UniProtKB/Swiss-Prot annotation:
Signal peptide: none
Annotated region described as Disordered, given as residue ranges: 1-21
Protein name as annotated: Probable aquaporin PIP2-2
Lineage: Eukaryota, Viridiplantae, Streptophyta, Embryophyta, Tracheophyta
Entry superkingdom: Eukaryota
Keywords annotated in UniProt: Cell membrane, Membrane, Repeat, Transmembrane, Transmembrane helix, Transport
Motif NPA 2 per record, residues: 232-234
One annotated GO molecular function: water channel activity
Protein topology in the membrane: Multi-pass membrane protein
Positions occupied by motif NPA 1: 111-113
Gene: PIP2-2
Length: 288
């Protein structure tokens, strides 16, 4: 384990050293973890967070499509509702809020792709990763189910918020969009939660959730026209299960394969290029 020393410059120009220590890699299988309440508390937090995330965001999508429906709102229907910008803000804003609320309990993953990337980087154990992903998928299904229950007259009519490949785009294009979008998200997660950054910015607790939420916002702006933006397999699965139409299931593999590949690339890039290269070049002083 390496213990690094980072120089910081307070007011007056004098530098003070601040130590930080990288946490040890999580064990692949930690059976003892199953006996701890903290694991189950974290799993519950992931379930509730993903439920709330899907409820708010899918309700926003359905509401926008209803407001912009020319058959319902004949006057300036195209300008009605929150628009794509508002949908992107709903997704990014909810991630910011929920990561802020759950980071100290579960790490605030709320996304199987994030959990998968952190597992590959040995940040979480296999047992925790599997339980998180199950909780996230179940939470997503329940969250979308609430939307359908509360907006039953609009839900099926406006597509149920399901991710589908838009007309005019090939499956390869959709897959590429999901890979790149998830890479941006997971890369941001690694950067925002880096131990060195946490040691430096620990007095500003919003600095981790803010860039993660903003990354989700930006990716949605870029990929909503292509796939409706997945980058979260639980989000795509939850809407497909409740909406349950052929089109949503036909493209479902894109919203699992793409995010998992993107997460794996982000994990490898951060762990074996950025962190490794910094150590080799001596960018940070080390007393280990």
């Amino acid at each position: 384990m390496a213990k690094d020393i980072e120089a910081s410059a307070p007011e007056g120009g004098e530098f003070s050293a601040k130590d930080y220590t990288d946490p040890p890699p999580a064990p692949l299988i930690d059976v003892e973890e199953l006996t701890k309440w903290s694991l189950y508390r974290a799993v519950i937090a992931e379930f509730i967070a993903t439920l709330l995330f899907l409820y708010i965001t899918v309700a926003t999508v359905i509401g926008y499509k209803h407001q912009s429906d020319a058959t319902v709102n004949t006057t300036d229907a195209a300008c009605s509702g929150v628009g794509i910008l508002g949908i992107a803000w709903a997704f990014g804003g909810m991630i910011f809020i929920l990561v802020y609320c759950t980071a100290g309990i579960s790490g605030g993953h709320i996304n199987p792709a994030v959990t998968f990337g952190l597992f590959l980087a040995r940040k979480v154990s296999l047992i925790r990763a599997v339980l998180y992903i199950i909780a996230q998928c179940l939470g997503a299904i329940c969250g979308v189910g609430l939307v359908k229950g509360f907006q039953s007259s609009y839900y099926a009519r406006y597509g149920g918020g399901a991710n589908e490949l838009s007309d005019g785009y090939s499956k390869g294009t959709g897959l590429g969009a999901e890979i790149i979008g998830t890479f941006v998200l997971v890369y941001t997660v690694f950067s925002a939660t880096d131990p060195k950054r946490n040691a430096r910015d620990s007095h500003i607790p919003v600095l981790a959730p803010l860039p993660i939420g903003f990354a989700v916002f930006m990716v949605h702006l870029a990929t909503i026209p292509i796939t409706g933006t997945g980058i979260n397999p639980a989000r795509s699965l939850g809407t497909a299960v409740i909406y349950n139409k052929d089109k949503a299931w036909d493209d479902q593999w894109i919203f699992w394969v793409g995010p998992l590949i993107g997460a794996a690339i982000a994990a490898a890039y951060h762990q074996y290029v950025l962190r490794a290269s910094a150590a080799k070049l001596g960018s940070y002083r080390s007393n280990a």
